[in-house]
């Protein structure tokens, strides 16, 4: 059946009425966006001859997505969050902004409220027998290449089971395990003493994995570490690096991998003096370069709902 009704006056009037496009009240921008999205959906139903059963399967899926609390996870897995980064990269290019550590997705598992320490923070609060010690360190520099004092570097990552604190279904981690924040001094240096993470997979019975199964895709990420870097003198940086050697680096279901964000992992001695769980530890140097404000403003601050806990 190839029924085409999208272009009819009846359907176009319905779209205008459903979104109150030409009516008073409401928010004009919201009307514009919803009208466009609803129009695209209606047209897709026409073009693909989507059946009522398929439409209601989609509606039921949205209910499950909300019940599972996985909308932000699906935003990563569907490529939506990566697409936003592609647009931001293009906007930077159009503005002539070059250099800086590449951005990549934030993901769904940040928790605000970590205590900010000066320069160094040991963030492995809970013991983890299966994870070896790791030191992550580097220098925050500005667009001029000089160290940035007073920058706040936030870091968060999974444990050896692939779970993030605060969201851990086993309840084995305190809220800020493997999460921390440090403020740089005049030398721009930061350091986190932690444990080696592993990658994670989507909850196997969750809505995100349900859709990925239909698409014939896996829902796994390589081992990685997230960062926010904030400074009054530069734009906020949202980035992450992958752990070198992980087999999923170039098969990340969230499309967050970038060539410049795979720093080498080296082995060092002297961990005992640093308060680590063993004398031999892994070391990752990850320098962070910020970019200039645009007309005196930080246009990289994204407003979205995030978990927050008092440290």
Swiss-Prot record:
Q: Does ATP-binding count among this protein's keywords?
A: no
Listed transmembrane segments: none
Which keywords has UniProt assigned to this entry?
Answer: Aromatic hydrocarbons catabolism, Dioxygenase, Iron, Metal-binding, Oxidoreductase
What does the record give as the reaction this protein catalyses?
catechol + O2 = cis,cis-muconate + 2 H(+)
The cofactor required is: Fe(3+)
Q: What is a biological process (GO) this protein takes part in?
A: catechol-containing compound catabolic process
What does the UniProt cofactor note say?
Answer: Binds 1 Fe(3+) ion per subunit.
Q: Which domain of life is it from?
A: Bacteria
Which positions carry the signal peptide feature in this UniProt record? none
Entry annotated with the keyword Oxidoreductase: yes
What Enzyme Commission number does this protein have?
1.13.11.1
Q: Subunit info? A: Homodimer.
Tell me the function of this protein: Can cleave 4-methyl-, 4-chloro-, and 3-methoxycatechol at lower rates than catechol, but has no activity with 4-nitrocatechol or protocatechuic acid.
Q: What's the protein here called? A: Catechol 1,2-dioxygenase 1
Q: Quote the gene name from the UniProt entry.
A: catA1
């Amino acid at each position: 059946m190839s029924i085409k009704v999208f272009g009819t006056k009846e359907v176009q009037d319905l779209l205008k009425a459903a979104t109150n496009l030409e009516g008073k009240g409401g928010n004009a921008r919201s009307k514009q966006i919803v009208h466009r999205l609803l129009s695209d959906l209606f047209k897709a139903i026409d073009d693909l001859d989507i059946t009522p059963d398929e439409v209601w399967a989609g509606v039921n899926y949205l209910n499950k997505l909300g019940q599972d609390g996985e909308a932000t996870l699906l935003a990563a897995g569907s490529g939506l969050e990566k697409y936003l980064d592609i647009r931001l990269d293009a906007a930077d290019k159009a503005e002539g902004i070059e250099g800086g550590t590449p951005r990549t997705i934030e993901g769904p598992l940040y928790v605000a409220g970590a205590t900010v320490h000066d320069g160094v923070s040991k963030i492995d609060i809970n013991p983890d027998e299966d994870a070896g010690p790791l030191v992550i360190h580097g220098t925050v520099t500005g667009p001029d290449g000089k160290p940035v004092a007073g920058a706040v570097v936030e870091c968060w990552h999974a444990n050896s089971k692939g779970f993030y604190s605060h969201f851990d279904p086993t309840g084995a981690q305190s809220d800020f395990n493997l999460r921390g924040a440090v403020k740089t001094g005049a030398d721009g240096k930061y350091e986190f003493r932690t444990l080696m993470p592993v990658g994670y997979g989507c909850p196997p019975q969750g809505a995100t994995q349900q859709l990925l199964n239909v698409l014939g895709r896996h829902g796994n990420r390589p081992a990685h570490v997230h960062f926010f870097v904030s400074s009054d003198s530069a734009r906020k940086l949202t980035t992450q690096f992958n752990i070198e050697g992980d087999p999923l680096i170039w098969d990340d279901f969230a499309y967050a991998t970038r060539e410049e964000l795979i720093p080498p992992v080296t082995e060092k001695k002297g961990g005992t003096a640093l308060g680590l769980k063993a004398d031999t530890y892994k070391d990752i140097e990850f320098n962070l370069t910020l970019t200039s404000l645009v007309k005196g403003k930080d246009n990289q601050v994204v407003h979205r709902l995030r978990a927050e806990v008092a440290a």
